[in-house]
Structure formats: C-alpha cells, structure tokens
Amino acid sequence: MSQISAREDSQSHAARDHWIAERLFDWSGLPTVHLRPTFFSEWLLFPYVRSTIVENGIIDLPYGNGRHAPIAGEDQARVIATILAEPAAHIGKTYTLCGPTELNQAGIAAAITEVLGRKISYQPQTIPQYRECLEKAGYPEFMIQHLCAVAIDYQNGLFSGEDKFIAKLTGKPPMTVQDFVASHRQAFATTSAAGR
C-alpha cells in the first residue's frame, strides 16, 4: 500500500519514501502489486478534520479547488482480498484506488451536510495557517511536513481521479462520501446531539 502522490520528486518526504519502497519491492524480485490510494474517506475521521466538522461545522483544509474521490478503507480491503485470492494477473501492476465520485472540498462538505442534516461548509486555509494548526495540535514535524506538501499536490490535481477499477474487480462499487458518513454518523454527532 503506497499512496497516489508517491513519486521520486515529491516534496513530501513520506510520499517520496513510499516511492522508494515501491522501487525496493520492484528490485527485490518479489511478486508485488502496488496500490496507490487517493485520500481515504477515513481522513474525515482524522482528529483535526473531524473536530472542525463537529465543533465548527466547517472543513478548513488548504486544498483550494483541488478534487479527489475519497476511498473507504473497507473498499481497499475488498481490493486487497480479491488480489490476494488470485494474485497472478496482478503481479507487477500499479493500481490507483479512488472512490466513485470526484469532489472538491465544498462538494465533500455538501455531501456531509446532506447526510447529517446540518450545514457543513468549506473554508480554505493557507498552508502556513494549516501548519500552525497542526503544530498547535502537537503533530510531529515529519507528519506536518507531509501533510503540508500533499496539500500543495492536492491543489495541483495530483489526488484527482474516479474509480475505474474497484467495481470491476470486486463486483461492488466503492462507497460514496454519503455512504461513508452515514455509516459513521455517530462520529460526526455534535456534543449536544450525542448527549440526547
């Protein structure tokens, strides 16, 4: 499991490390399949992201008008299980894993709004503002460097794409943002709603 932004010239040290790990597997001669997912749907549950949704009704990430089709962990697990069941046809291949519908952050906020029945908005930050928030939250520098670098990649379209593989391989389309939020509704409950 790598990531969609893995490449030799990545400004993210972590994404470059993923690219290096892919090359090591390729050079090893071991039968390998590389999976490069875009941002997971679970990113919405990441403490910093989730807390701004729950507490403030906003997504405040520095992603500009970039787009991606969030991919749920359980959809990735189905892909992995299917490949492991019959690996021969997949050895040596690299697959990009995306959800079914590409959205910008305003579209993701609208999808969350649709499910939760309360207004969620996208309020983009600058990269320096984002870095400051992550530092205040106590994230390690390696992670902050990665998240800020991939935010620029996101703005530049590196995370874009829609599923052309999962439904065909597994026989089931990947979850939409709405499906994911509905299945994790309790995680997005406000304090007042959770206390009822």
Question: Residues of each region from the PLM?
Answer:
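Oxidoreductase cofactor-interface core, primarily capturing Rossmann-like NAD(P)-dependent enzymes
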Residues: 4-121, 125, 132-137, 142-143, ...
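N-terminal Rossmann-like NAD(P)+-binding domain of SDR-like oxidoreductases, especially those catalyzing
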Residues: 1
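A hydrophobic C-terminal alpha-helical subdomain
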Residues: 128-196
